[in-house]
């Protein structure tokens, strides 16, 4: 029995499912989840001392690679001054100033401790600002696990949302309206019907929780225009895309300005953190300036601020995101070439330093329906074959992959060599 198998068996005694976040359990791909004990650069090492090229990157934060020395030094330095104060610090202001400088739509910022807190708070703020109750989200998009967002579309063209998880009251879900991603006509029709009741539209500008689905040309600007027409707050959930697809996030990459944005992952440099912000006119409604309540004991935690500030400064150097995107492009081109050579139906997507892999006959991936054409069983086999070859991919056919600046030619060769063998075995 491997060390990971032993640890997983022990973990299940007191941790539900043996993990603290469901995707880690390998339910989508089968087998025993790997337990890691070390990470450095582009690699993670499991409890059995096997090393893997990592394309999960802690689900996005590790854009510099793991254990970047300057980030670790910043955390160590702050560690000597205390873990948490429950009071304002200079670093919080530095972080707010830097985020507002990097993302022009951000005029004011509130720090929180997770992406879920950020999206939950942004939606509450939008409701408080507009005096409206309903929100619009998109099929296949994930915005954290707060009750009003664990909702899927019901039947019919225009319907109230229904809970997608036990424990979410139907009374909460009825205010969440779900429409297809990348379908502007569906949004237009819905707003024509109930626009006066809608507080906000929340969208992942790149849908990263149905693998990686970029927006169709004109889609994000179309949402912007519709929100302006109906007095609806446009929220970009950039927890995944922020500072990754471009330094200014997806909003800079695609040239569309939201009213509010949420961030997480990279902004904490690997520490638990998130933030939301946007127009001063809207953010002024948050307590203590305004009546919309939001608070957090560990918000603006100094260790997280130290890691996040250092990370954001390091990724701000000229050419950083071009290098990241170029590696990702070469990776996907190499995978596509090897899949084609093996006669395997395969298509990839990319947005900067994030990517999607689909075992599909579809010519392109644009909609949720396109995503669902991917052969999940074939992905399972591919995942384990790549694992045997020393490559760690996201353990789900519906999660995005991530590259880091630590990935280079050696990691590319190892990955593509493993993929060539894996594709051959899939015939």
UniProtKB/Swiss-Prot annotation:
Reactions mediated catalytically: (S)-4-amino-5-oxopentanoate = 5-aminolevulinate
Species of provenance: Pseudomonas savastanoi pv. phaseolicola (strain 1448A / Race 6)
Protein name (database record): Glutamate-1-semialdehyde 2,1-aminomutase
Entry superkingdom: Bacteria
Principal EC category: isomerase
Family to which this protein belongs: Belongs to the class-III pyridoxal-phosphate-dependent aminotransferase family. HemL subfamily.
Record gene name: hemL
Pathway linked to the protein: Porphyrin-containing compound metabolism; protoporphyrin-IX biosynthesis; 5-aminolevulinate from L-glutamyl-tRNA(Glu): step 2/2
Known EC number: 5.4.3.8
Cofactors: pyridoxal 5'-phosphate
PANTHER family: GLUTAMATE-1-SEMIALDEHYDE 2,1-AMINOMUTASE, GLUTAMATE-1-SEMIALDEHYDE 2,1-AMINOMUTASE 1, CHLOROPLASTIC-RELATED
Entry GO MF terms: glutamate-1-semialdehyde 2,1-aminomutase activity; pyridoxal phosphate binding; transaminase activity
Keywords per UniProt: Cytoplasm, Isomerase, Porphyrin biosynthesis, Pyridoxal phosphate
Quaternary assembly: Homodimer.
GO cellular component: cytoplasm
Modification type N6-(pyridoxal phosphate)lysine: residues: 265
Annotated SUPFAM superfamilies: PLP-dependent transferases
UniProt subcellular location: Cytoplasm
InterPro entries, per the entry: 4pyrrol_synth_GluAld_NH2Trfase, Aminotrans_3, Aminotrans_3_PPA_site, PyrdxlP-dep_Trfase, PyrdxlP-dep_Trfase_major, PyrdxlP-dep_Trfase_small
Record-linked Gene3D superfamilies: Aspartate Aminotransferase, domain 1 (3.90.1150.10), Type I PLP-dependent aspartate aminotransferase-like (Major domain) (3.40.640.10)
GO biological process terms, semicolon-separated: protoporphyrinogen IX biosynthetic process
